[in-house]
């Protein structure tokens, strides 16, 4: 059977449901697919389809995630839903499911709970740009005043984490009633999706950003020069353009004299392409895995940064023992391991801790032995002897 072609006639946006356990994230996700399926914009899925999320591995970490897709009039969405709280933490920190925005699900019967707060904090820390609130289980609350109080509480909570609490839409829904086909509540799901369309900005396409390719391999072609291969992370590169080689050693300038993909010559390579770039005047010894090729002047290498880190439990293949400040692991950044040191850390809420236990989430300061192209929002893994013991996201560049 021929593979169905992915139609690119609508902008694509990645979103997900976040919020406290049992507030109805998965039921709401199922309800969205069912309501949109009636207009031919999704395949209807029930709770069980989504809840039985398969395991995935991302940077050596096992995560359960369910993926559904659907469309609205103006957009195509890929939507992620995670069964367990730990899956959310791992998913958001590893960037396994990069979110352009999220639907925060909060039950009107409970109001904001511990994980509601934790997911809002996590969304802020990993750079989820926009939220829409689905106030769920509204069919179970008769008193309009209670609903108003819960809405106020949610807005104050969003404000306290630097989201624009007053402006974020809060839509009253009942995932369960919509799933049962109650037309009043079905129309509320449509209202929610209109709010998502309007409030979650369309992401800048990777291809429109400045060029960057992490070097995976280097070889020389007799009579032609040195070729660096890798996947173009963003932007595009044309034959004849100047690019900089950044990281590990001093930054240097070179010219791209050829772009190859699947042994064919191209005029240009763009985001997502796996290419070989022929570089003028560069010896094989001058360039190595872990460096990046970038648009001139678009990026500088750094050695010191702050990060949000999830440290793997022993059962997940992580360490069996705690570590302390001064710990020297490898940081796996893009395509290579760089030795570094964790010079300081606090728990994720900013309180002081003496040591880090497997399973902890921390804020840490890291220092690398050589400068590499790190950027805010970038993901990395922490490794020890080739195995992953933690995953993180760069929250701030220090030096």
UniProtKB/Swiss-Prot annotation:
Region annotation G4: where it falls in the sequence: 136-139
Taxonomy, superkingdom: Bacteria
Enzyme Commission no: 3.6.5.3
Claim: Ubl conjugation is one of the keywords in the record: no
Any one GO CC term of the record: cytosol
Residues of the tr-type G domain: 10-204
TM spans (from-to): none
Cystine crosslinks: none
Residue ranges of the region described as G1: 19-26
Region (G2): 60-64
Catalytic activity: GTP + H2O = GDP + phosphate + H(+)
Main location: cytoplasm
InterPro entries named among the record's database cross-references: EF-Tu_GTP-bd, EF-Tu_GTPase, EFTu-like_2, EFTU_2, G_TR_CS, P-loop_NTPase, Small_GTP-bd, T_Tr_GTP-bd_dom
Region (G3): 81-84
Stated family: Belongs to the TRAFAC class translation factor GTPase superfamily. Classic translation factor GTPase family. EF-Tu/EF-1A subfamily.
Function summary: GTP hydrolase that promotes the GTP-dependent binding of aminoacyl-tRNA to the A-site of ribosomes during protein biosynthesis.
Protein name: Elongation factor Tu
Organism name: Prochlorococcus marinus (strain MIT 9301)
Lineage per the UniProt record: Bacteria, Bacillati, Cyanobacteriota, Cyanophyceae, Synechococcales
